[in-house]
Amino acid sequence: MSTLTPGRPYAPGRQGFSSLRAGGLNWDAFPLRLFTKGNAKFWNPTDLDFSRDAEDWEGLNSEQQRNSTYLVAQFIAGEEAVTEDIQPFMKAMAAEGRFGDEMYLTQFCFEEAKHTQVFRLWMDAVGLTRDLHPFVAENPYYRQLFYEELPGSLKVLETDPSPVNQVRASVTYNHVIEGSLALTGYYAWQKVCTTRGILPGMQELVRRIGDDERRHMAWGTFTCRRHVAADDSNWGVVQERMAELMPLALGMIDWVNKQFEVQPYGLDDQEFIAYAADRAQRRLGAIESARGRPVEEIDLDYSPEALEEKFGEEDAKAMSEAAG
């Protein structure tokens, strides 16, 4: 019979428990602040009513429905992809001994799964039940981003969770996929629905998702900031990865636009490109501001959260104006 010796590590090598250490968990640390905030803002996809959306969908013309299907297919496939691909980041945080980040990323992953659920419920409600793979798989830029770059940049963390790889993964996942693509797409779609007074269920689900995603963005900015503060060369990694991926993001949007001779909703693409560029530059500015800062200060610096809250206020104001 084996004898258990207190204090000796056992497979798989756990040394102890963060929750049992003297002083417990630091609830003021940035990741746990986001975790607490997310718990307070819980919402249930099955509580949303999509009955009016089904009626409004039937009132759209065929090109508007086709354009909307491109958007929704990209949204839901993206939410499914990020649900799967965030998981190696949890292991990276475990390897770094950052249990607070692990806690937040479990909530983060759950929320991405919930976003997949709510889009699928909406699609079922309006009758989008056929195979929609062509709406994403035929877009070469979408394929490169979501089939290759996103999973590839996250999967490497399973074997090499170095700061450089964490920064590359965060820029890919948070700043390009979530920030430049998803949140900009949600803003554009929300503006279409609000201006036309249609699809109230979609408007509500996008509002809920956007609130979650801004917390995700805050964590991504925070993660890049702490690595930039620790090693200034990581700022170059941020810039390099953004430069690699932004042409793909713009190409993905342009490819969809070229599937239509006339824009079905009459959107001004330049407005949303400017929106995405403005948000990207302000987030990059938040990361750059960590250069030369003591690393220990970053955990208690809530400026990434404040920035995302500011973005939320700006979006709400824009939607109020769009509604008239």
UniProtKB/Swiss-Prot annotation:
Probable oxidase. Belongs to the ribonucleoside diphosphate reductase small chain family. R2-like ligand binding oxidase subfamily. Residues 304-324 are annotated as: Disordered. This is R2-like ligand binding oxidase. There is a cross-link at V82-Y173 (3-(O4'-tyrosyl)-valine (Val-Tyr)). Fe cation binds at E112, E178, E213, H216. Its EC number is 1.-.-.-. One of its GO terms (biological process) is deoxyribonucleotide biosynthetic process. NCBIfam families: PRK08326.1-2 (NF006199), PRK08326.1-3 (NF006200), PRK08326.1-4 (NF006201). Binds 1 Fe cation per subunit. Binds 1 manganese ion per subunit. The iron and manganese ions form a dinuclear manganese-iron cluster. Coiled coil: none annotated. InterPro entries: Ferritin-like_SF, R2LOX, RNR-like, RNR_small_fam. It is an enzyme of class 1 (oxidoreductase). It comes from Rhodococcus jostii (strain RHA1). Its cofactor is Fe cation; Mn(2+). It comes from the Bacteria. The keyword ATP-binding does not apply.
